[in-house]
Regions:
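Short N-terminal segments
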Residues: 1-2, 33-35, 161-162
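A short, Lys/Arg-rich alpha-helix, primarily the initiator
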Residues: 1-13, 79-92
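A structural feature that tracks compact, well-ordered secondary-structure segments
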Residues: 10, 16-28, 35, 40, ...
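Short, surface-exposed loop/turn motifs that are enriched in glycine and acidic residues
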Residues: 46-50, 78, 92-93
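Residue-level marker of regulatory loop/turn positions in helix-turn-helix DNA-binding domains and
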Residues: 49, 53, 81, 85, ...
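Intrinsic disorder/low-complexity detector
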Residues: 60-85, 152-191
Length: 191
């Protein structure tokens, strides 16, 4: 998932201004400027857009954890140089002190119900036989559910509406392909 999308979504959901965003990065011992934040929050088609790399998003999420949970004793957790959706979800779960039931409820708010076993697969170590990689669509729905929970809105910022529309189109074409495969399988059995 695009890191800039995560930043835009968190900023909108929790109504975080530039000064607060600078403070969140400072919590993770990182200095950023308003100009950097502005460039990271721009849409891709804007000429001033700059992609936020994994390291900067990891630092932001670590700072977000500190903002919500306080600084832990001892050395701070080193930010990951490579992020995936599973790590992003885990960091948000920690920051917001969410239990598995809370995450399931948030996904249900975004019309994406899942079970506990499916959710636990996202938190397993890579390489574990039950580990499952979280797809962009599911993280996008989690972010949408967070917004509904914290802002009480079903409406999304414009860039998010486009993402969800594209997701529905992908799901519909996947369903049609699957239906066609099932129908041809049934047809072949009848012959």
């Amino acid at each position: 998932m695009e890191n800039n999308y995560i930043l835009r979504r968190l900023r909108y959901t929790f109504d975080i201004n530039d000064k607060q965003m600078i403070k969140i990065w400072a919590n993770a011992d990182t200095t950023v400027t308003r100009e950097q934040i502005s460039a990271w929050l721009k849409k891709e088609d804007d000429p001033a857009y700059i992609m936020c790399n994994d390291l900067n998003l990891a630092k932001f999420l670590n700072g977000f954890i500190i903002k919500h949970r306080g600084k832990s004793d001892g050395p701070q957790v080193a930010p990951e140089s490579r992020l995936n959706n599973n790590i992003i979800l885990r960091k948000l779960k920690i920051a917001l002190t969410l239990r598995d039931d809370d995450v399931i409820e948030i996904l249900a708010l975004a019309d994406k119900p899942i079970g506990k076993s499916e959710l636990s697969a996202f938190f397993r170590k890579k390489g574990h036989q039950h580990y499952r990689e979280m797809q962009d669509q599911l993280l996008r729905r989690f972010m949408q559910g967070l917004q509904t929970k914290h802002r009480g809105e079903n409406e999304s910022p414009q860039d998010v509406k486009v993402d969800i529309t594209q997701e529905k189109q992908q799901n519909n074409s996947a369903d049609q392909t699957e239906d066609a495969g099932i129908n041809s399988h049934i047809w072949n059995k009848k012959k």
